[in-house]
């Protein structure tokens, strides 16, 4: 087809970091479908789009461009929140393309400076390490208790100590003061974290920004899940949902309760009131999953 005037496309996903990373595959596939198109994005999390070769401009949600300047506007806000029984990324793709068999993988693009910074950080660490996100922030159901984490590490280090644990995330997330642990919280941007995970033996964590940065990498993932069903959140890689991933859901019988929440799911309520899911895991299963990648 001869296209004399490329179309202008605007894609919006307000937040959060993980959700914006989920939307990167949509933009890539739009660029494949409309090769000459000019694609702009609007979001709170502008840093996710740094170095992305598929976009022209990025705008903050507080200062968006006029929608009438675009031939096609795709609003991915509440795409999966309104349709939670699907894989979250699949719901985003459906809003953009309808039913499709496109590549639903996510992506981030570290540049040479990003890689150099991470490589220098890793010089004293060595090449045998796992990346772990011990989340401690909003939404208690996602904050796996330290009792679980300590039990996992006791099993791991009881049999071997030939690797280190690099802890990532924000300042509120957990870190353990121990010679085998390395504190990398608040040290890396999304692209650098992706590159760090590329070098790792595996990534361990729950649905979060670091989890989706790892999803963009080649690192195996040990996914610890509570309120979100396995089939909704394991990343797509090589056109396979959950490729090179091991899911370890909570043992609570109400696991995956995200699907039971009021639509769109922007407020989550625990029917038990105490989020016991974050402290009820098969510790041996987690340790075994990690050991399989060491």
How does the language model describe each region?
Residues 1-294:
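Catalytic machinery of carbohydrate-active enzymes
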């Amino acid at each position: 087809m001869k296209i004399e005037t490329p179309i202008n496309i605007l894609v919006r996903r307000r937040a959060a970091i993980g959700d914006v990373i989920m939307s990167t595959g949509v933009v890539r596939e739009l660029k494949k479908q409309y090769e000459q198109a000019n694609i702009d994005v609007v979001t709170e999390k502008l840093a996710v789009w740094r170095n992305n070769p598929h976009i022209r401009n990025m705008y903050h949600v507080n200062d968006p461009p006029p929608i009438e300047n675009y031939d096609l506007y795709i609003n991915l806000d509440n795409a999966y929140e309104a349709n939670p029984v699907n894989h979250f990324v699949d719901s985003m793709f459906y809003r953009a393309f309808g039913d499709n068999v496109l590549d639903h993988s996510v992506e981030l693009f570290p540049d040479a400076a990003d890689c150099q910074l991470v490589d220098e950080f890793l010089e004293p660490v060595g090449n045998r390490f796992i990346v772990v996100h011990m989340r401690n922030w909003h939404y208690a159901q996602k904050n796996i208790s330290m009792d679980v984490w300590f039990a996992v590490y006791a099993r791991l280090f009881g049999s071997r100590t030939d690797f280190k644990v690099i802890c990532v995330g924000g300042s509120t997330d957990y870190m353990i003061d121990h010679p085998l642990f390395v504190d990398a919280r608040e040290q890396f941007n999304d692209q650098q974290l992706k590159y760090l995970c590329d070098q790792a033996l595996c990534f361990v964590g729950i649905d979060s920004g670091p989890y989706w940065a790892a999803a963009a990498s080649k690192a195996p993932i040990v996914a610890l899940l509570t309120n979100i069903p396995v089939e909704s959140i394991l990343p797509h890689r090589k056109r396979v949902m959950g490729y090179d991933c091991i899911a370890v859901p909570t043992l609570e019988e109400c696991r995956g309760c995200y699907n039971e929440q009021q639509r769109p799911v922007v407020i989550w309520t625990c029917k038990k009131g105490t989020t016991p899911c974050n402290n009820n895991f098969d510790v041996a299963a987690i340790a075994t999953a990690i050991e399989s990648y060491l």
